[in-house]
Structure formats: structure tokens, C-alpha cells
């Protein structure tokens, strides 16, 4: 179909116009316009009509305007009578059905050309949507030619055909986006009279400056963007391949089986052994969920090399009823090759790939945020079915197993895996698929039934009754004892009083008497809050909170000691000070204290607590009596904004409202405290609340099935309540772990709740041996494994809420072994220590062996 307007009106329509369409009543004309908005969508072709003229016609039949006169199309055409570029519907043109177009021309006449276009149906049969192919793809066709051996037999087909070949002008033609690559091959064969059986291939050049029909090898090599149109992709349409106007280069095979371009492409193909570069992906409207998943898949270098080396071509299963006609695999291969030939730190658009995915799953076809893990699951399954080497799946009876004799279990497991691989054989099975053991047990008679099922990824639950783990610091009331780090572990529903009780027990085992404890959350040198005994630790103590437990004694008076760095005082104002570090405490025996004695005790306190030797003459004290009725620790919540009076008296009076500040200048501050973790809050307080080990253990816990999921027990011969237990039986080379952070189901993402727990997972040496089913400890498959160790190489992260969140990815570059963060088009290096975050959603591990 040509890109020019297809009909000359003067040869088909009369140049007449009328005052009123006489062939239809007035109301029928209005109904005709309304019905036509849907009518053209059901036909094979439609016509473009000048928007202003058509609006004038609508006004005319409603009695709101004059007769529009003949249809004028000149505004849509250029000087070559071709459709102008960048025209827009409802601004420059309207779309009408063929029947309405012909009727309007008969009524009003036509000045200009009729512009007819194909109506394409995009998507699966049940979800197809009409799309008018306004701008067909225009190609120029060239022939790869060796000027040195121009007369040799490798190009004999070129010299056996008549025009249009003998002209030096490139052959120009247009193609509809709905036509397949097979149709394009056929049209090229017809244009050049190429006989069946002649081996040739087509190269696509996106940005071509070629003007001659013949293209030399050196010219071919100089082209900026070249892609081979694979004969394996003949089922895909031009729309799906996502190629635009450009040039096609025809290359014939030499009788000896060689291709002229191989002298160049062999050189280029060596780069396949080079790891794929760092390339960003453009966000196509909330497509970050896809981009993050793709970055993880792209950095699965075993799969990427499989595609870049074209090994996939021989495996494509076009006829698999469970597959996608090979299109998902072909589109992904095209995306990888585009990325592979893109310079590092640049970006590409995955638009064609996204369209193909949306064509087979409308859930991913729009511009709404979707679940990245669900995309990964669909994508892996689609790749597997497109690349399944089993053309006709044989039927097998599933073996039953009602006992747990180790030999029986192993025999049935082997049978199940053998059956699975006889029906499923693909690179996805080889890399990603493992198998788990599923055991049902009747709650009445305890009859068991065991089955073995393959998995592509493990969905791990986050324990609902996870342990609360935190590090706290105990500060004793006496200056003769150093602070102590305590590692506490309690149930999530525990309270602060229970936390104190566990801390007291640990201290007593160390031979330390702590008295009544005060629990404080310390932030930037002040008491941010004093924790109440009834407070739940999971709600009041957050992951990064610094919790300090202050001991007490019945003897004497204990006062807080805070640390301040002097700030220059403005004339006429009090000294202002910045507080830092953790408040300490000092026990004094008398309310009347000599300043010099107090300084000596504080100097000793610093030495014991922090290992700092301070010259007595360098320490300056500030004193403040708090007016608040609250306790002494509550009093220093706002300590950084209180003004302290410099102690100059020889003797001072201490009471339970007194707070002492030790004042340091900038030089002392840097010199004395730089390496002091107690003062500078360098202690790592947070401990993981959930580990990946916790999740794996939770995965294998027996689960009580709901009543609606009652199991038909072969022992009871009736439906019975049952428990179900899953155990890992066989591990894949690439282990994908989905951390199930979201609860709730259905399409409304706003109703899905997210857990933001930090799940701590190893970056190196994840050992899964302890999580395998105990029945395979002596199994030959296990003994054949060099190790059960896995290294992390990619993470799919979800930030924020499900309905308005954002996805990013961390991935390890295989050549440099460096981790990078991918945020759509933004790429930056990241330290391996920083990739364990509470945003981790899908983990990608690779077996070390």
C-alpha cells in the first residue's frame, strides 16, 4: 500500500455539490454520523477526511452552518501529493468508514485525493483494539555488493532479472505495520524476482544515507545502526518488531555457503563474549516495575549470552498452544541486542517489548503501576513456553505416594522430575526451575500424601510473629563501671518492661546490679523520649533508634552529664552550645559539691566510660536547673535549646533537677572524641528483625488449610481438614526469591498492604543445605553438588506503597563484579554493603558451582 493518497477523485467522483443531501432524510444523516464513529473500527479500511471540512458538514446537517461545498483534502497533502507528516486526529483529520466516505463524495464532490488506510487490530483476539495505520513504513531496498568480485557467481541472481533491478536507483516501497516479516520477505522476492530456494537475508538500517541501489562492504560497515531481520521472526508484524522508516539491505549467500557480511559480523560477534554493558531503560509511563525486573534479567548473564549468541533461534516453538508464538522470546532477543550495541551508561526504549507483553497479557498493556514480581513470573513462563523444545508434550500419569519411606520418596521424586523434563525442556528449565516436595496430612487419621512440583521462583512469607532484635547500651550509675552493650531478642508483642527484665537478667549474669532501669531513646545528644513500661517495643522502638538503659542506685544522687561544643556567644547573650553523643550519668554522695571535686569525678567518668584522658584544667562545666516537673531524664528532651550558666563558684548545690554540661571547644572536640564510638553514636544499634533464614524456615512450616480447602483423604474416604508442608527438594542454578511483602489480592492495588520489615539476606555464600528436605540428605543429586552456596547478583526493589510506589534494581556487572543501581535511565555504582535494604522485593541468586 502506498503512502500517498490512494485515489484521484477526478477519475471516480463528480465535482458537484448540493444544497442538501437529498438521498437521506435529515435525521438519518445525523444517525449516520453517530453510527460511523464505531463502524469504521469493524472494517478493513477507513478514510481520512479534512477535520475542518467534516466539522463544517456536521454543523450543516444540524442546521448550524452553511453547505460546506466539495470535500477539500489539500491541507492534508504536500507538494508530492503525499500525506504530510505529524498530522493529528481531531486536529487535522477525522476518520470515517468507507461507506460514509463514498456517500459524502457522491453528495458533495471532492477536490484533492482520497486517503485510504488499513485498520489494524492490535492485541489478542479477545482484547483486540482497532488502530488506523496512518503512516505506513517506507523502505528503500539496496543490495550488498562486492565491487572486486562483482561478476562472480555468488551474485548470479542479480544478473538474471529485469527491471527494476538494472536501475541504480534504490527500489522504494511502503509496508503496513500490520504486515508480517514473512510478507516483507515475500514482497522483496517478488520485486527482485528471486526464485524459491535462493538463500538471502535482509538487514535493516535505521539511519541510512544510502542513495545507490548497490552498497559496498565498506559502506555497509560504516552504517551507524544495523540489525539483521531474523528469519525466525517471520511471524511478527512490523508493528511488533518496532522498526520505522529506513533502508533494507539484501544479501545473497555465496554457493560455498558463506556470506559476504560475515567478514565484518564475525568480528562484531566476538563481542558477544563481552558482558552486556550498563544501559538504562526509558520509563514508558509507570513502567518502572518492568524496567527493574528487566535489569535483573539482563544481568542473568547465562540467559543473556544464550540470546546474544542466537542459540535461541533453533529452540523457538511457534506452535506451542501455551506459548506466545515465539514473540516474547524474539522481542526480548531484539531488546538485548539493542542494549548490547548501545554505549555504556546510555538508555534504550523497551517499547516494542512492552507492547508484545501487553498483547498477551492486558494486565501489563496500559500505563498503570503493576507488580514487578508478577511481571517476572509471567515473563519467565512466557519465555519457557516460547523456547520449549518439546513440540508435542507426552501424557504421563502422576505417581502417587502415600508413605514416607526414604527410598519410595526418592524414587517418586526422580519420576516426577523425569516426567517434567520430558514435557518441558528449555533454557528456563535449565537455569531457573527447581522442585519442591509438598506433603498433605489428614488431621483426623494422619494419612499422608506427597507430591513433587516444579517451581520457577520461591515465594517466601515474612514471619508474622518475628522476633524483635535490638542492641541496647547499659549505662551504670557508678563511674567505676564502663557501659555495656546488650543484645536483646524478644517477641514482637513484648513491652518495654519485658525488655528491661531481659536486660536485668543478662546484667545479673555478668555480676552487675543495675537497680531500676530507665529506657531512653537518644537522638543527637538528647533524650528524644523516655520509654514507658507499658509501651510495645515493636511500635515505640524503631529499627534505627538508639536505646540506652540508665541504671540507678538508692545511695546518693544520680545526675545526667551531657556533652556540648561551644558556639561563639553574641554580645549581651548567654553562651549557646551544641550537644552531641549519649548523655552519661554521675552518682554524687552529697548535695553540696566542690567544683574541683566534681571536675575530677567527671574526668574519671570520661576515662572509664570512653577511654578519654582529659586534663583537669581543660574541662569547663555548665550547669542548668530544669524547671520542669517531669523526671530528670524527661527534663533534657530539649536540652540543646536551654542556656547553661558557666560554673565559676568553688562550691555548687546539686539536686534532682540539676543537669551538668561538659563544654569543649572545637579543637578539643575533634582531638578527644573523633574515634570515640560511645560519644559519637557510632554504635550500630539496629539488629535484623527478620533474616532470610527466618523466611525460609517459615516457608517450610506446616500450614493448616482452610475449611474450604479440605482435602479428600484416601484413608478416611472423605474430605478432611489437613495440614500442608512445602520443602525444597531440588535447587536451580539461578534461584529467584520473592519476599511476599504484600497482603490482599485483586486488581485494586490500593487495597494491598505492604510490610516494610528489613529482611537481612546474605550477599555472598547463602547456604541452603539446611533448608533442603531431610529425605534427600543421602540422595545422589545432593552428593553431586559441589556446594549449596549462592551469591546474590541482582535485587528488584519496591519503594513506597503499592498504589504509588516506585521500583529500582541493584545488579552486579559480570565483568567488573561491581554492583550498580538502576533507576530507569539513571545508573550509579553502589557499595555491596548498601544493597541490603527494607525495599528488597525479589532477590536473584546464582549457584557458586
Swiss-Prot record:
Keywords linked to the UniProt accession: Hydrolase, Protease, Thiol protease, Ubl conjugation pathway
A Pfam family: DUSP
Listed GO CC annotations: endoplasmic reticulum
SMART domains: DUSP (SM00695)
SUPFAM superfamilies per UniProt: Cysteine proteinases, DUSP-like
Top-level taxon: Eukaryota
Annotated USP domain residues: 279-848
Single GO biological process annotation from the record: proteolysis
The reaction(s) this protein catalyses: Thiol-dependent hydrolysis of ester, thioester, amide, peptide and isopeptide bonds formed by the C-terminal Gly of ubiquitin (a 76-residue protein attached to proteins as an intracellular targeting signal)
List of catalytic residues: 288 (nucleophile), 806 (proton acceptor)
Keyword Hydrolase included in the entry's annotation: yes
InterPro entries: DUSP-like_sf, Papain-like_cys_pep_sf, Pept_C19_DUSP, Peptidase_C19_UCH, Ub_carboxyl-term_hydrolase, USP_CS, USP_dom
DUSP domain span: 20-120
Name of the protein: Probable ubiquitin carboxyl-terminal hydrolase 1
Amino acid at each position: 500500500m502506498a503512502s500517498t493518497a490512494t485515489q484521484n477523485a477526478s477519475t471516480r467522483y463528480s465535482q458537484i455539490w448540493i444544497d442538501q443531501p437529498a438521498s437521506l432524510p435529515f435525521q438519518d444523516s445525523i444517525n449516520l454520523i453517530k453510527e460511523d464513529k464505531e463502524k469504521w473500527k469493524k472494517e478493513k479500511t477507513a478514510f481520512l477526511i479534512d477535520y475542518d471540512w467534516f466539522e463544517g458538514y456536521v454543523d450543516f446537517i444540524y442546521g448550524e452552518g452553511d453547505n460546506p461545498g466539495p470535500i477539500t483534502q489539500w491541507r492534508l497533502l504536500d507538494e508530492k501529493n503525499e500525506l504530510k507528516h505529524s498530522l493529528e486526529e481531531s486536529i487535522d483529520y477525522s476518520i470515517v468508514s468507507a461507506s460514509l466516505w463514498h456517500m459524502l463524495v457522491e453528495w458533495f464532490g471532492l477536490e484533492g485525493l482520497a486517503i485510504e488506510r488499513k485498520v489494524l487490530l492490535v492485541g489478542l483476539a479477545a482484547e483486540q483494539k482497532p488502530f488506523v495505520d496512518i503512516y505506513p513504513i517506507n523502505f528503500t531496498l539496496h543490495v550488498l555488493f562486492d565491487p572486486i568480485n562483482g561478476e562472480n557467481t555468488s551474485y548470479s541472481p542479480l544478473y538474471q532479472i529485469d527491471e527494476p533491478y538494472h536501475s541504480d536507483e534504490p527500489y522504494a516501497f511502503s509496508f503496513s505495520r500490520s504486515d508480517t516479516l514473512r510478507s516483507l520477505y515475500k514482497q522483496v522476492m517478488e520485486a527482485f524476482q528471486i526464485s524459491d530456494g535462493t538463500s538471502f537475508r535482509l538487514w535493516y538500517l535505521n539511519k541510512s544515507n544510502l542513495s545507490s541501489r548497490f552498497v559496498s562492504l565498506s559502506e555497509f560497515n560504516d552504517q551507524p545502526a544495523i540489525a539483521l531481520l531474523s528469519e525466525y521472526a517471520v511471524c511478527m508484524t512490523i508493528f511488533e518488531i518496532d522498526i520505522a522508516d529506513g533502508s533494507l539491505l539484501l544479501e545473497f549467500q555465496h554457493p560455498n555457503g558463506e556470506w559476504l557480511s560475515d567478514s565484518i559480523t564475525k568480528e562484531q560477534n566476538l563481542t558477544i563474549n563481552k558482558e552486556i554493558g550498563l544501559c538504562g531503560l526509558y520509563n514508558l509511563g509507570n513502567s518502572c516495575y518492568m524496567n527493574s525486573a528487566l535489569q535483573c534479567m539482563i544481568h542473568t548473564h547465562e540467559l543473556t549470552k544464550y540470546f546474544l549468541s542466537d542459540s535461541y533461534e533453533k529452540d523457538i516453538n511457534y506452535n506451542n498452544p501455551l506459548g506466545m508464538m515465539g514473540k516474547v522470546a524474539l522481542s526480548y532477543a531484539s531488546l538485548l541486542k539493542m542494549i548490547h550495541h548501545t554505549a555504556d551508561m546510555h538508555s534504550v526504549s523497551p517499547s516494542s517489548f512492552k507492547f508484545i507483553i501487553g498483547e498477551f497479557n492486558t494486565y501489563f498493556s496500559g500505563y498503570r503501576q503493576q507488580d514487578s514480581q508478577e511481571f517476572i513470573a509471567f515473563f519467565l513462563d512466557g519465555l519457557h513456553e516460547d523456547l520449549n523444545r518439546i513440540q508435542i508434550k507426552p501424557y504421563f500419569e502422576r505417581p502417587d505416594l502415600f508413605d514416607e519411606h526414604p527410598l519410595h520418596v526418592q524414587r517418586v521424586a526422580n519420576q516426577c522430575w523425569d516426567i517434567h523434563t520430558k514435557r518441558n525442556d528449555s533454557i528456563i528449565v535449565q537455569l531457573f526451575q527447581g522442585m519442591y516436595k509438598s506433603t498433605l496430612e489428614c488431621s483426623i487419621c494422619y494419612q499422608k500424601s506427597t507430591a513433587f512440583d516444579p517451581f520457577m521462583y520461591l515465594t517466601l512469607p515474612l514471619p508474622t510473629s518475628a522476633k524483635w532484635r535490638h542492641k541496647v547500651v547499659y549505662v551504670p550509675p557508678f563511674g567505676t563501671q564502663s557501659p555495656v552493650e546488650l543484645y536483646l531478642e524478644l517477641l514482637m508483642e513484648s513491652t518495654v518492661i519485658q525488655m528491661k527484665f531481659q536486660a536485668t537478667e543478662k546484667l545479673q549474669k555478668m555480676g552487675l546490679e543495675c537497680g531500676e532501669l530507665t529506657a531512653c531513646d537518644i537522638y543527637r545528644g538528647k533524650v528524644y523520649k523516655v520509654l514507658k513500661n507499658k509501651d510495645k517495643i515493636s511500635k515505640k522502638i524503631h529499627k534505627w533508634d538508639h536505646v540506652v538503659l540508665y541504671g540507678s542506685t538508692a545511695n546518693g544522687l544520680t545526675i545526667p552529664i551531657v556533652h556540648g561544643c561551644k558556639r561563639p556567644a553574641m554580645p549581651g547573650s548567654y553562651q549557646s552550645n551544641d550537644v552531641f553523643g549519649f548523655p552519661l550519668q554521675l552518682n554524687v554522695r552529697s548535695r553540696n559539691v566542690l567544683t574541683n571535686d566534681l571536675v575530677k569525678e567527671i574526668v574519671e567518668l570520661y576515662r572509664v566510660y570512653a577511654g578519654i584522658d582529659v586534663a583537669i584544667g581543660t574541662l569547663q562545666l555548665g550547669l542548668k536547673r530544669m524547671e520542669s516537673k517531669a523526671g530528670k531524664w524527661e527534663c533534657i528532651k530539649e536540652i540543646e535549646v536551654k542556656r547553661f550558666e558557666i560554673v565559676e563558684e568553688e562550691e555548687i548545690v546539686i539536686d534532682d533537677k540539676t543537669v551538668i554540661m561538659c563544654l569543649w571547644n572545637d579543637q578539643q572536640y575533634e582531638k578527644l572524641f573523633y574515634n570515640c564510638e560511645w560519644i559519637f553514636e557510632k554504635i550500630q544499634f539496629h539488629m535484623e528483625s527478620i533474616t532470610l533464614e527466618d523466611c525460609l524456615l517459615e516457608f517450610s512450616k506446616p500450614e493448616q488449610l482452610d475449611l474450604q480447602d479440605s482435602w479428600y483423604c484416601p484413608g478416611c474416604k472423605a474430605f478432611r481438614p489437613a495440614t500442608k508442608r512445602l520443602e525444597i527438594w531440588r535447587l536451580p542454578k539461578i534461584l529467584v526469591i520473592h519476599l511476599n511483602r504484600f497482603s490482599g489480592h485483586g486488581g485494586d492495588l490500593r487495597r494491598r498492604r505492604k510490610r516494610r520489615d528489613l529482611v537481612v539476606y546474605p550477599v555472598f555464600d547463602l547456604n541452603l543445605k539446611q533448608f533442603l528436605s531431610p529425605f534427600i540428605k543421602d540422595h545422589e543429586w545432593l552428593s553431586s553438588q559441589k556446594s549449596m552456596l549462592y551469591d546474590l547478583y541482582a535485587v528488584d526493589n519496591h519503594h513506597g506503597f503499592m498504589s504509588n510506589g516506585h521500583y529500582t534494581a541493584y545488579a552486579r556487572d559480570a565483568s567488573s563484579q561491581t554492583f550498580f543501581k538502576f533507576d530507569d535511565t539513571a545508573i550509579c555504582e553502589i557499595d555491596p554493603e548498601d544493597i541490603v535494604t527494607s525495599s528488597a522485593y525479589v532477590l536473584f541468586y546464582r549457584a557458586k558451582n
